[in-house]
């Protein structure tokens, strides 16, 4: 989840540092939530609720006191594991400006869960993503155009988890994995880059995952995945259906993909005294 929420970016020195720190902070706060939940369940407390991204967002913004004091309060909980407390203390040890930048990077994608509707919708689930090859089901994920930009991150997260959970075990290794699963992605590029999809497209068919994507042009795919990854994605689709292009560049590309065919025709001409037959290739 952290890799989807905090992608690599341009890999420059500062950017890489803050990306790594945001991921580490996300994991530390996630551990804190899960360990608190496990403790509450052991004590049979009525407030014991499964951890959610909404809860993690609220944990990341604190309770109103200075953030360093809030994080230190979390780290001082003796009932948390050593690894969780160590990660929280490492975050507290950062300089003020650095800590502020790390927390800004951490909270940026989690800001989606400030929306109470999204928070409520992602606080429970009706399906388990690792069951799509075990049970016959159809799952629709519908986003209206006015919410597409806002929901793109959530859609990437869902499909990343779906692919991750279903490329761990081959059907030959588990007889309960009986059903192929088709991922039909309309307006594929509108959800942005899904790194795990670009990495797994060459072998996911072996796990009975089928991929059907709909795009407007190859230029869209190039813009999101880059020329090489876009070509790799297109190549790993067994069939491509091309409709009449609107742009000359797409027309040339499709023409090159289709290649040329030699047609042989015979032409015969006859005069008063002579007859001539010619075979032409075109």
PLM features per residue range, with description:
Residues 147, 217-219:
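Active-site-proximal loop/turn and secondary-structure-junction residues that shape catalytic pockets
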Residues 1-209, 225:
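P-loop NTPase motor domains
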Residues 5, 9-23, 28-31, 198-202, ...:
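P-loop NTPase motor core of the ASCE superfamily
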Residues 210-216:
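Structural recognition of the conserved hydrophobic beta-strand(s) that form the central parallel beta-sheet
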Residues 139, 212, 240-241:
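Hydrophobic/aromatic beta-strand patches that form the interior of the parallel beta-sheet core
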């Amino acid at each position: 989840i952290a890799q989807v929420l905090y992608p690599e970016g341009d890999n420059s020195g500062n950017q890489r540092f803050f990306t790594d720190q945001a991921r580490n902070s996300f994991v530390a706060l996630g551990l804190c939530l899960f360990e608190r939940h496990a403790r509450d369940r052991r004590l049979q407390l009525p407030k014991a609720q499964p951890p959610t991204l909404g809860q993690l967002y609220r944990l990341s913004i604190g309770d109103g006191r200075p953030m360093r004091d809030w994080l230190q309060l979390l780290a001082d909980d003796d009932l948390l594991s050593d690894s969780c407390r160590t990660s929280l203390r490492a975050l507290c040890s950062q300089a003020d400006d650095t800590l502020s930048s790390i927390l800004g990077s951490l909270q940026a994608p989690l800001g989606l869960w400030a929306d109470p509707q999204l928070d409520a919708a992602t606080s429970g689930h009706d399906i388990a993503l690792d069951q799509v090859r075990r049970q016959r089901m159809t799952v629709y994920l519908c986003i209206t155009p006015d919410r597409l930009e806002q929901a793109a991150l959530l859609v990437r997260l869902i499909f990343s988890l779906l692919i991750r959970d279903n490329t761990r075990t081959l059907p030959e290794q588990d007889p309960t994995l009986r059903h192929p699963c088709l991922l039909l992605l309309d307006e594929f590029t509108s959800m942005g880059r899904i790194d795990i999809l670009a990495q797994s497209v060459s072998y996911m068919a072996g796990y009975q995952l089928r991929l059907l994507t709909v795009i407007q042009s190859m230029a869209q795919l190039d813009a999101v995945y880059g020329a090489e990854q876009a070509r790799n994605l297109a190549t790993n689709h067994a069939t491509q259906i091309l409709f009449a292009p609107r742009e000359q560049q797409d027309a040339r590309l499709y023409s090159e993909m289709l290649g040329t065919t030699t047609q042989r025709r015979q032409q015969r001409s006859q005069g008063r005294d002579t007859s001539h037959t010619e075979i032409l290739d075109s």
